[in-house]
Amino acid sequence: LARLPVIVGFGGINSAGRTSFHQAYRRIIFDLLPNDLQQEVLLDLANITQIAEFQNGLWLTADGEALDAETLIDTFGEEILARTLIRRIHPSLFDVDNVVLHKSSALSPVSEGEKLSFSVKTRSLPDNIPANWQVKALSNTHSEITVDGTLETFIKDTKSLSVKAAGQLPTGFDPAKLYQSRNHPRGLQMTVYGASDAILSSGLDWDVVRNQVAPDQIAVYAANSIGQMDDLGFGGMLKSALMGKRTTSKHLPLGYAQMPADFVNAYVLGSVGNVGTSIGACATYFFNLERAIESIKSGKIRVAMVGGSDAPITPEIIEGFRTMGALAEDTALLALDLLENQKEPDHTRSCRPFAQNCGFTIGESSQWTLLMDDELAIDLGATIYGAIPAVYAFADGYKKSISAPGVGNYLTVSKAMAYLQNIIGKEGLTKHTFIQAHGTSTPQNRVTESHVLSKAATSFGADAMPVTAMKAYLGHSQGTAGGDQLHLSLGVWEHGVLPGIVTSSEVADDVYQAGLKFQLKHEEYGKTHFDAALLNSKGFGGNNATAVLLAPHKAIELLKKRYSEEQIEEYYEKNAAIKSAATAYNEAMIRGEIKPIYRFGFNVLGGEELDISEQQIKLPGYEIPVDLNVTNDFEDLI
């Protein structure tokens, strides 16, 4: 029998805040929360954004005021909320009104017959002196240059970006300050924070977990879709020479797209188990999730950390997407709202999935999911937040433009619906399942994805499957977007509210709606109304994926058929302690008392420390050895 992959921990950070304990989800449905939970969300964000620091039972502001929680919220509540979700890009990343560029120019003398001359530090002279230059030493440090003809130059300039909105991490949050970041690119700083959050919020002791399984039965599958493109990664490597700077030894290696997985193995978990990076544009998270799911179901691995960390809010990436016509520009947003005398649009409504829209809004996020097989979760008493029995991924086939949509998403959605129907029945699929759409907010996406979803839904007999899209709040975090969709969906079963696409006032006329119910408002369905969710992704290049997510109550219902009443009762007894530890972590995080896991140089192993025999490999620090009694899958060929 196949093992059931269950979610036992999740965490990270996006523009809505910390993911664990549904804090980011709660920010999205903030207005529907009771007062005590609103206060918890605001205090957590106050700590994250560094508006206040918890000390001696009070909240200390940057001005030195010591406030109680109620006063802090009354004073800063609106400001805290304004620092989240999609909004105008804050200068802490870069100044959208003054982005540096260089213009190519040819300088020539004002009067005919004259020559250009200037002085420069001798050490700044080019290695290869142009043929039309005459160089004369002025002193030990400076030289005079006389140019015969024109001087080819790059003149520094600035410009204002036409795209000014993004799903930026909460303003004031700086992951580099939380550990010894050593010039790590932003995406890797976010990785350390996000992966730590997922592990610690589970309430599980990681040393206990890893000593329950063999070292090679733990896996990390993670990536981002673009690489670390900021100045501390590939971005610095590509432009440093043109900016008159030096390439460092870290630019290239830390820029690789697989680095989130590498960092988790090397500095967070210390894992020597299976590792892999699948990259597929917007579907990257689901591609890595699929690998984990299939490996757990087959028994190859028992524990998997799936993750992604994308930090694509850079001028270069924004300009790249803009020239494709993919991003929502300010002028287009103003035109959509018929605002002629307004300088800037409402940036908080930049992303409008399935409505009249004009492009997606870029976002940044780091999301991490801790999965186990059902047997291990039951043995440990791990909290089960849901189960993922299947992920489907298919390509588009032949096409003209590589970025154009194709048929692959019809296959992934239809396969996922068929699989889910086999588990929860036709009524469960059509009446008790919601769809977490890709929902980018481009005119093309609203037509093509709605047709995919409508065609599949009606084919299975659905008449009103709820459809929502979290990019309306978070923006498009590229390869990590699937993690945003997954983790915010889990909140529906904690609070019973399906978030609506509130930035979209009405569904566009060209959107296919048969069999679907586009959720434009938050709606309370109840915690157990939905048995499952379908998480969809349509990526550039033909990278399509759809994940099947089972509700926690449905996962437990299924497991009760595999385990005895006594085993389930024992599980709940163990789980009480796990939940208590997780709750203590959440409370400590709100107070800012917990730092990310970052174990640089911790328990580093060398080959001489391994005990290798013909049957097994023993590693220091691991109770269970790696088994070398490997099964031959091709005995019939021997």
Segments (PLM) and residue ranges:
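Acyl-CoA/ACP chain-elongation machinery
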Residues: 300-358, 391-405, 437-446, 463-516
